[in-house]
Amino acid sequence: MDCYLLLLLLLLGLAGQGSADSHPEVLQAPVGSSILVQCHYRLQDVRALKVWCQFLQEGCHPLVTSAVDRRAPGNGRIFLTDLGGGLLQVEMVTLQEEDTGEYGCVVEGAAGPQTLHRVSLLVLPPVPGPREGEEAEDEKETYRIGTGSLLEDPSLDPSASAGPHEFRRRENSIPLIWGAVLLLALVVVAVVIFAVMARKKGNRLVVCGPSQSTGVPGMDPPSAAHRSSDSGLPSDIPHVRLDSPPSFDSIYTGSSLDPPSSEPPAPPSQPPLPPKVLMSSKSVTYATVVFPGGDKGKIASCEPVQDPPNSQTPPSK
């Protein structure tokens, strides 16, 4: 009976070893992640050496063992722990792409090395997806929301709660504000100066306007300025003013501009209106006739007539 029991256990062990060798467990993990593998061993192998090895072409390459050897350099990314009660646990952390391969738990018992469990590990390279961008946007939004909540609290310091970009933006806005204030002050000063100058110029025109003379430049004011009479002519020029426009008859057609002679003029056929004559003590060399009611700018004048050398001006009466 005992022989049959031992034979049955041996067959089960061989079957388990064959199944472990032929059908390894497939595990897929991304770069930087971790895996945890548990292996069951027999209770009679509790004191046996447990090994976590990588299966290569030349055989099992041990990575970590249950024996504590302080002289051998340990692997900082693979940990083997014997939990007792026939349970062995292996953990691989911070996986890299070169960790891809086939691994297994091996127990070196009295019957020889026995593979308890095999694992086919595939380490996937990192693939940036839209999820990472969404998480980054969510983090930025969370940072903005948190910053806004801190700023809304009046008990907190705004400069301490603001982020670096917000603080840099405030530093850049300070010179712009001062520049705008300086420009506004310059505009106000320019407007005030312009208003004062315009007021001074207006006062100068009001004071100097009536006293300006219409004389020729380079002449003295007394000699250049002439008082004008109501006819628009200077008072020192002899002229005749007629109350009404004269009729163009033979009286004016045959008139001469020669100096007055001693003989009295012939009496006119029709008595004209008495003209206003301004007598002058000087000899008259030209005459000016002004018609009332007409344009003052249109004045009939004649060329001056030179006196003969031997003629004598009769004395005025």
From Swiss-Prot:
Post-translational modification comment from the UniProt entry: Phosphorylated on tyrosine residues.
Main localization, broad class: membrane
Tissue: Highly expressed in bone marrow leukocytes, splenic megakaryocytes and platelets. Detected in brain, liver and in peritoneal monocytes.
Location of this chain's protein in the cell: Cell membrane; Cytoplasm
Stretches assigned to the Extracellular side: 21-175
Subunit structure: When phosphorylated, interacts with PTPN11. When phosphorylated, interacts with PTPN6.
Protein name: Trem-like transcript 1 protein
Gene this protein is translated from: Treml1
Compositionally biased intervals (Pro residues): 261-275
Cytoplasmic compartment spans: 197-317
Location of region: Disordered: 147-166, 212-278, 295-317
GO BP annotations, alphabetical order: negative regulation of signal transduction; platelet activation; wound healing
CC annotations in GO: cell surface; cytosol; Golgi apparatus; nuclear speck; plasma membrane; platelet alpha granule
Cited InterPro entries: Ig-like_dom_sf, Ig-like_fold, Ig_sub, Immune_rcpt_domain
Start and end residues of each Ig-like V-type domain: 21-122
Biased composition annotated in UniProt, kind: Polar residues: 308-317
One MF annotation (Gene Ontology) recorded for this entry: signaling receptor activity
Sequence motif: ITIM, positions: 284-289
Segments passing through the bilayer: 176-196
Function: Cell surface receptor that may play a role in the innate and adaptive immune response.
Signal peptide annotation: 1-20
Organism, as annotated: Mus musculus
